[in-house]
Amino acid sequence: MTDTYKMVEIVGTSSESYEMAIKNGLARASQTIKAISWFEVIQQRGAVKDGKVSEFQVILKVGFKLAE
């Protein structure tokens, strides 16, 4: 038997760090996507307010196994 996976893109955010943005994105995605198998960071970026970093953002590709 072979397995089939699906990929979706999500954006995780945090006011603290890129690492927390990844964790926040995966935590939220896991509420609706079961059996997340892997992730890939596609892009890192941030928002600036009043000359200071106000938000860290990461675009993630998330892969999960399709139910049988």
Describe each PLM feature range.
Residues 2-38:
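Short, well-ordered alpha-helical segments
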Residues 11, 42, 63:
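Residues in well-ordered beta-strands of folded domains
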Residues 36-40, 46-48:
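Amphipathic, hydrophobic secondary-structure cores in small proteins
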Residues 45-68:
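A cross-kingdom feature marking charged/low-complexity
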